[in-house]
Curated annotation (Swiss-Prot):
Residues 69-85 have a biased composition (Low complexity). Pfam families: SBP (PF03110). It is found in: Nucleus. This is Squamosa promoter-binding-like protein 9. It comes from Oryza sativa subsp. japonica. A motif (Bipartite nuclear localization signal) lies at residues 228-244. GO terms for cellular component: nucleus. One of its GO terms (molecular function) is DNA binding.
């Protein structure tokens, strides 16, 4: 995406950029892999698609309406042709001031749009003055005398009438250059005809642009939301002044400061309006973070605790000092957090040891900015987010989309870091905004969504209001299937609640891009086949959508994220995995082993929700591990948190005999870190966690290399053990490290976790229903360790044993024939005698 000339978009950021700093890499933020403008823009509708697809200017311009003759004559005469008597008469009423753009050197030189902040402020003052005059005096009517006087002046001038009108006024759009002398003063001042002013896009300076009715300038299409006729910056002030306030439901309380007006829409276009814009870089930013607690209308008994890695109690910090940025941190209401967590833990159906526990849970941080252009995002904002999280996260992947400007970052980091972010979010947000050279300083008001916490950072900290929004936020219950083969079309089913609302939009993000897809709702009374299975689902309580993605990259593997957005805000996110064909086939078997079958609920949607929750943490960790890291992430490959994640995954796979997936993980480890680097590590003096990591890698390679022998041993173990070992550990139960790898138990995973100091359980990413609890595997589906069964003979001993068994069977058969059928001995011996005599004679 090309940056605007001169880098003007980043100049108003509060002086955070030094003069000697090199030019930012505009096209690379958080490894977005930006190829063109379409990669960052979602399919907003047929209108916007048509704009970008058809560059022909003539097809985009509507037919030009002809101006009325009376108005044309009156406007053509202009104020310059009024006689002194008419000017004296008009002095009694307010006379419109001359547009300052007519004396702007940038504007007269043809640099449109011109970047003059002082001119914009003067134009805004004129607009406010015009509106105030209209409200006080009502609709003004043009005096008849003015028209007659103008006409008389024009007629009286005779041949010299051209001296009172502009010599030549044409539209500024190349290829149009329509005569605008007969149009109203607005169009003459801005040098634009009616067709170009109402066109969806025109070609100006080699770029498709659209005319902004508020600015009087042409902007690039990215500065507009959907089919709006005003740019985002002007639309915020315009809507604050012209729109009526919404109803009491979903708005801020009446005592909120008049400078801002928040609607109930947590993510729609333009719900945050600024009235007073003051972007002087010398002024210290005064902000406030108001408490916004979401009371979501969820199904009865829904478990909000499982929606994100953290859910802390609300904490308020009020500071009215004008020299510092003030905040008040709040957390979304987690109704019955401790009770629900206790109930879930004590449930006989929920066995935490039978599920995968991630050492680095994945969460979501979203920034909603209002005065940013996606093309102007600097690369160093990635480093600023890293510093904000106090420690380098294990994984970080970001996505940008319009709608103001929304930056969504999916972060995987250790549990203790999520706890720290939850306990002290207010101060961390404060440090993010007020950090030296902060790119968010001076950018006005914006939102920050940290998992289920929503922060409103305002520009003026004079008023602090705590508000409780009564909204029904969208909720995704499950996505089926949860993994797809790379390079193949993706067809999935999405089930949720409160999804089909105004401004509905489905989002599928993968590898730094939002994937273009088709989404349609399947009516509740319809019966459809689930993808990948012949199971029929008939659901009348939940909303079901079908998402189809026709193309995907063949050589790109990793996690993808499914979200839904509507007028009530952004839903929870559900991860899916894009991998190789071999990995997808193995995940199907692992899914059956982890979940098995459950008779707890007869509802198909509830049953699929139960099955998916056991796989979410496992899937997203595999996705991060097989994903090719960026250049900035190579320096973090051997960090403590990253090594612990590799150990956690290999330990789980070894304990449960998932050898095929273990082979994929080992190959991915060799490709990412490199076998040469691993061999060099073994020669040096290492820390305990690195030693443990190398021990698991060695054990995993031995198991993969001896897989044929290991598979035969496992088949014998499963057949001989059956149900005769009731005391054997179930699937996923931890066994001592010395038994599985032969290393000392003092280097166990949890003993090396110096940061947290205790076992970390992976909180689920989605907000599950109460019945969405991990189910037991069937008792017959046991994956036993080789150490649990006695040693079985192998190699040469097996061949000798087989030969002995065959010879014994032949001898027994011969003895039975001689004893019980003596008259048959001659019949059976005749062929043998002939065969032996034939061989002897030859």
């Amino acid at each position: 995406m090309d940056a605007p000339g001169g880098g003007g978009g980043g100049g108003g950021g509060g002086g955070g950029v030094d003069a000697g700093e090199p030019v930012w890499d505009w096209g690379n933020l958080l490894d977005f892999a930006v190829h063109d403008d379409d990669s960052l823009v979602l399919p907003w509708g047929d209108d916007s698609i048509g704009i970008e697809a058809d560059p022909a200017e003539a097809a985009l311009l509507p037919p030009a309406p002809s101006p009325q003759p009376a108005e044309a004559e009156a406007e053509a005469a202009g104020p310059a042709s009024l006689p002194s008597s008419m000017q004296a008469e008009g002095s009694k009423r307010r006379v419109r001031k001359r547009d300052p753009r007519l004396v702007c050197p940038n504007y007269l030189a043809g640099r449109v749009p011109c970047a003059c902040p002082e001119i914009d402020e003067m134009a805004a003052a004129l607009e406010v003055e015009d509106v105030a005059t209209e409200l006080l005096a009502g609709a003004r009517k043009k005096p008849k005398g003015a028209g007659r006087g103008s006409g008389a002046a024009v007629g009286g001038s005779g041949g010299g009438a051209s001296r009172g009108t502009p010599a030549e006024m044409k539209c500024q759009v190349p290829g149009c250059e329509a005569d605008i002398r007969e149009l109203k003063g607005y169009h003459r001042r801005h040098r634009v005809c009616l067709r170009c002013a109402h066109a969806a896009a025109v070609m100006l300076d080699g770029v498709q642009k659209r005319y902004c009715q508020q600015c009087g300038k042409f902007h690039i299409l990215l500065d507009f939301d959907e089919d709006k006729r005003s740019c985002r910056r002007k639309l915020e002030r315009h809507n604050k002044r012209r729109r009526r306030k919404p109803d009491s439901k979903g708005i801020l309380e009446k005592d909120i400061d008049d400078q801002l007006d928040f609607s109930a829409d947590g993510s729609g276009d333009g719900e945050l309006r600024e009235e007073n814009i003051d972007v002087t870089t010398s002024e210290t930013l005064e902000t406030v973070l108001s408490n916004k607690v979401l009371d979501r209308e969820t199904p009865v008994g829904s478990d909000d605790v499982l929606s994100s890695p953290t859910c802390a109690q609300p904490s308020l910090q009020i500071d009215q000092s004008k020299s510092l940025v003030t905040f008040a941190a709040s957390v979304e209401a987690c109704l019955g957090t401790k009770q629900e967590n206790t109930k879930l833990t004590n449930s006989p159906v929920h066995d935490t040891k039978s599920t995968y526990s991630s050492s680095c849970p994945t969460g979501r941080v979203s920034f909603k900015l209002y005065d940013w252009n996606p093309a102007e995002f600097p690369r160093r904002l990635r480093h600023q987010i890293f510093e904000w999280l106090s420690s380098m996260p294990v994984e970080l992947e970001g996505y940008i989309r319009p709608g103001c400007t929304i930056l969504t970052v999916f972060v995987a980091m250790p549990q203790h870091m999520w706890d720290k972010l939850s306990e002290d979010t207010g101060n961390l947000v404060k440090s993010l905004v007020n950090a030296p050279n902060s790119l968010l300083l001076g950018k006005g008001a914006f939102f920050i969504h940290v998992n289920n916490m929503i922060f409103q950072v305002l520009k003026d900290g004079a008023t602090l209001t705590s508000t409780r929004l009564e909204v029904q936020s969208p909720r995704i219950h499950y996505v089926h299937p949860s993994w797809f083969e790379a390079g193949k079309p993706i067809d999935l089913i999405l089930c949720g609640s409160s999804l089909d609302q105004p401004k509905f939009r489905s989002l599928v993000s993968f590898d730094g891009l939002y994937l273009k897809h088709d989404c349609r709702r399947i009516l509740s009374h319809e019966t459809f086949d689930c993808i990948g299975s012949g199971e029929h689902i008939l659901d009348s309580q939940h909303e079901i959508f079908r998402i189809n993605i026709t193309t995907s990259k063949l050589d790109t593997h990793g996690p993808a994220f499914v979200e839904v957005e509507n007028m009530f805000g952004l839903s929870n996110f559900v991860p899916i995995l894009v991998g190789s064909k071999h990995l997808c086939s193995e995940l199907e078997q692992i899914h059956d082993a982890l979940c098995g079958s459950s008779d707890i609920s007869s509802d198909p949607c509830e049953l699929r929700g139960l099955r998916q929750t056991a796989m979410l943490g496992f899937l997203i960790d595999i996705g991060w591990l097989i994903r090719k890291p960026s250049i900035d992430e190579f320096q973090n490959l051997l960090s403590l948190a990253n090594i612990q994640r590799w150990i956690c995954m290999m330990k789980f796979l070894i304990q449960n005999d998932f050898i095929n997936v273990l082979e994929i993980i080992v190959n991915s480890l060799d490709n990412i870190i490199g076998s040469e680097l691993l061999s060099n590590l073994e020669k040096g003096r290492l820390e305990n966690h690195v030693t443990e990591f190398l021990g698991y890698v060695s054990e995993a390679r031995n198991i993969v290399d001896n897989r044929p022998k290991y598979d035969k041993q496992r088949q014998v173990d499963t057949r001989w053990a059956g149900d005769y070992a009731p005391n054997q550990p179930k699937l996923g139960i931890s066994v001592p490290l010395a038994e599985s790898t032969g290393t000392s138990g003092e280097h166990d995973l949890h003993s090396t976790n110096a940061a947290s100091g205790e076992e970390e359980n992976m909180p689920l990413v989605t907000k599950a229903l109460p019945h969405r609890q991990c189910c037991h595997p069937e008792t017959s589906a046991r994956w036993l360790n080789a150490a649990s069964i006695g040693a079985f003979p192998g190699g040469a001993m097996r061949m000798r044993l087989a030969t002995t068994v065959v010879i014994g069977a032949v001898v027994c058969f011969a003895a039975c024939v001689v004893l019980f059928h003596p008259h048959r001995v001659g019949v059976l011996a005749a062929p043998v005698k002939r065969y032996l005599s034939r061989n002897y004679s030859s």
